[in-house]
Amino acid sequence: ENGLERTGLFQHYSFTPDEYHIYEDYKDIPEKTFDYVFICSKTVANDDISRKLAENKEILKDNCKIIIFQNGFANDEPFLRYFSEDEVYCARVITGFSRPQRHISEITVYTEPILLGSLQNADPKCLEKIAQMISASGIKCETTTEIDKYLWAKMLYNCALNPLGVILNCTYGKLTENEYSKNIMDSIIDEIFAVIKKSEYSTLWNSADEYRKLFYSKLVPDTYNHYSSTYQDIQKKIKTEIDTLNGTVIRLGEKYGVDVS
């Protein structure tokens, strides 16, 4: 009833309820409605969303692309049960948001452009149009053939910061001011690099030490006052995405024989 608003950094937008459609049931959506479907839910809903989209494929246009805007890694797997590799893509978002009210999204931190690509080596050129549309809204967006590297870069960042920020009830920056929390974050970073090296994946840095230099000199200072999405979930008493963050590292550690205990 209050519409939708985007505030904070960049251009502000507001939309009244008569400027968009909300569907309460898939059956209410006309056939061939969507060129793109953005998956912006918490990752715990992916099994249900992927299944229901598959059951209602008639609402998707023939060349519809599903783009997953979520924390974590391998979030495309539930959708690949029902859709082909050239229909499912992932986004790397390293922009901070908060939701002061249910209808307001506030951009609190911006570090790098949104990146769109495929974890299955599909050509991302088909996403150029939607990347341009997102950029036109005020948040820069680009495509990449190396989305896996960038998603692992975000995993390094989120897995080191999010759980501790919740447990210690503090911002990202405060975590770097205590030697005990720094030691824990350093250990998490080491574990993730060990998993990456044993797996078929790669990231943007050659070693944990190389990443740590950037982490403490730029990445955390740039987001010093930010509270993680995991922290916000706990405050709202809703399920977190920890299973697709640190939980993914644990599962891959077990798969590749890396001690992440």
Positions of predicted regions on the chain:
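Short, hinge-like loop/turn segments at secondary-structure boundaries
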Residues: 5-9, 84-85, 105-109, 159-161
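Helix-loop-beta segment of a Rossmann-like dinucleotide-binding subdomain
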Residues: 35, 57-60, 104-115, 166-177, ...
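Active-site-proximal catalytic alpha-helix in oxidoreductases
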Residues: 148-176, 180-193, 220
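NAD(P)-dependent Rossmann-like dehydrogenase/reductase catalytic/cofactor-binding core
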Residues: 135-136, 186-261
